[in-house]
Amino acid sequence: MLKLTYILCLVYILNGLSMDAQSLKIMTYNIRLDVPSDGENNWSNRKDFFSSQIQFYEPDIFGVQEAKPNQVTDIATALSQYNYLGIGRDGDGKGESSNIFYNKERFSVKETNTFWLSETPDIPSKGWDAAFNRVCTYALFKDLKTNKTFWVFNTHLDHMGEEAKTKGIQLILSKIKTLNSKNYPVIFMGDFNSEPNENRILELRSVMDDSKEVSEQKPYGPSGTFNNFKHDQPVTKLIDYIFISKNSDLKVKKYAVLSDAVDLKYPSDHLPIFVELKYK
């Protein structure tokens, strides 16, 4: 009887480990740049809660937007289990960046780069009618738990230029098509500064799956992601997304917008999106 109990326990543990290996937790997070004019919402007052939030949810990979060099350093120092990829929009170590942080024990990086959303994507540049330089950072990861390979693209589209937003998405999709000759699964995430009913998002949904729309479980949390640091108001403006390539080996099990706060203060003016994916 004891032997049977031992075997059953071992099977249960191994099954749990297998299920965990098949799961992939992804997060996108506009962390709000470090700017003194934010007053009580300055990064120095937010960074500890931000880091503790990441520690609690334990994403395997998370993409950030608006990260200034000092913020990237703070995150890397506080969350030493992650390595990060990506450079600033004004050049290496300059300006805001859209970094990809990944669990360094679970993943190896096969390929990575940062390009600019412009007519000259290989050099720091501002595209079309954009107000600022904008970038996309991407990486090809190998999951050391499963030996699966997949791409991650992380971006922050312009907040002003309508043409820049549309052509920025088109440029990224073109880059995905060029790079992904082996048809690996693709995760495309970030702050798109575009709401769900805008044509560019509708068109993107025709070629990739919006994780919110295809989640097996009912989406959790507020309907929007941009909170503007206003904890006393509903969050209804949705401008952040995680898209998954259609007909890929990844399925969306759970989707959530996380509205955690401490003392009625958010860790950013955006709420993060957290999804749990699973391999088919």
Q: Language-model segments: which ranges?
A:
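Active-site environment of divalent metal-dependent phosphoester hydrolases
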Residues: L33-P36, A67-T73, H159-G161, N193-N199, ...
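N-terminal, active-site-proximal structural segment of metallo-dependent hydrolase catalytic domains
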Residues: L2, Y6, M19-A78, R89-E96, ...
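Structured beta-strand-rich core segments of catalytic domains in phosphoester-bond hydrolases
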Residues: I61-W151, K254-V257
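Metal-dependent phosphoester-hydrolase catalytic domains
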Residues: E163, K167, K177-V186, S194-K280
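Active-site neighborhood of phospho(di)ester-bond hydrolases with catalytic His/Asp-centered motifs
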Residues: G63-Q65, G86-I87, I187-D191, D210-E213
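Bacterial N-terminal signal peptides
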Residues: Y6-G16
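Acidic/histidine-rich helix-loop elements
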Residues: T28-D48, L117-A131, D158, Q233
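Active-site-proximal beta-strand elements of phosphoester/diester hydrolases
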Residues: S23-V35, E111-F115, K148-L157, H270
